[in-house]
């Protein structure tokens, strides 16, 4: 018996196990007509199977699709820009920025050995592993950054936001993926870690926006992510700039939290 991710790689269905994992996570792998949801699924190689694997993701992680939606909705063009990706993980956001023409991306993550191998080798990517973004400074990111993107888990963004202003250009933009499950109190989180109540989702957006405003970053645009989180949570993509905006509450109120 062979793991499905290994089987896909060895038999030419995927170029690497990372690619196989992405296809599995996206629900793009079937064995005998059954969608495979786990890379640990075992295939009996002594039996002939009808295996289908579609590598339809344009980025190394599904997060790239979320950032793509934000860049389009907010009319932000990374072409020729210096960027920072906080919470880079496998590099979905970083990959999206590069494919949109970014000339340099600081890929920052507190973990290690997560960034896609091809991205590690890309000369435009500065991989900063084992870096706690709560202590981000100009020594860690020496360049003035045009675009900061952020997708962090298991920590409130409010602990990182105070560090952003020192590396962001005066005319720069900050795009963040707001995950209510990491911004709300325990009372808001239900079974499976899901935040179901619209009022709690709204509270999460307001909390992040308030933290940004306290640090000179103001909400300019906001959308509901077209893709839910891996755990099924509704998420939001927000755009902040250093330009004061008196319409923040109107922007917040214009989004569906149901």
Q: What role is predicted for each listed range?
A:
Residues 1-48:
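A basic, amphipathic helix-loop patch mediating RNA/tRNA/ribosome contacts
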Residues 29, 103-106:
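Short beta-strand element of Class I
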Residues 79-89:
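Conserved class I S-adenosyl-L-methionine
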Residues 90-101:
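Conserved SAM-binding loop of SAM-dependent methyltransferases across substrates and taxa
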Residues 106-159:
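S-adenosyl-L-methionine
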Residues 158-175:
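A short glycine-rich, Lys/Arg-flanked "PGG" loop and its adjoining helix->strand segment in the class I
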Residues 180-197:
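Short, glycine-/aromatic-enriched active-site segment of Class I SAM-dependent methyltransferases
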Residues 227-257:
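Core SAM-dependent methyltransferase catalytic element
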């Amino acid at each position: 018996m062979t793991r499905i991710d290994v089987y896909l790689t060895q038999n030419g269905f995927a170029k690497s196990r990372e690619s196989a994992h992405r296809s599995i996570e996206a629900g793009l792998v079937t064995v005998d007509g059954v969608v495979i949801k786990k890379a640990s699924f075992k295939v009996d190689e002594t039996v002939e199977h009808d295996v289908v694997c579609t590598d339809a993701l344009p980025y190394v992680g599904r997060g790239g699709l979320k950032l793509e939606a934000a860049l389009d909705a907010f009319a932000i063009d990374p072409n020729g820009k210096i960027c920072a990706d906080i919470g880079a993980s496998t590099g979905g956001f970083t990959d999206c920025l590069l494919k949109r023409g970014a000339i340099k991306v600081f890929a920052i993550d507190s973990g290690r050995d997560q960034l896609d191998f091809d991205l590690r080798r890309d000369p435009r990517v500065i991989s900063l592993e084992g870096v706690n973004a709560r202590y981000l400074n100009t020594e860690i990111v020496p360049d003035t950054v045009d675009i900061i993107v952020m997708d962090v888990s298991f920590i409130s963004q409010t602990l990182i936001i105070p560090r952003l202003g020192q590396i962001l250009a005066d005319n720069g933009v900050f795009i963040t993926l707001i995950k209510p499950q990491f911004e709300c109190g325990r009372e808001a989180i239900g079974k499976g870690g899901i935040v179901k109540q619209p009022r709690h989702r709204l509270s999460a957006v307001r909390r992040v926006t308030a933290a940004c405003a306290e640090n000179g970053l103001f909400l300019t645009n906001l959308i509901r992510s077209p893709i839910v989180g891996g755990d099924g949570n509704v998420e939001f993509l927000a755009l902040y700039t250093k330009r004061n905006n008196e319409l923040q509450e109107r922007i917040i109120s214009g989004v569906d939290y149901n």
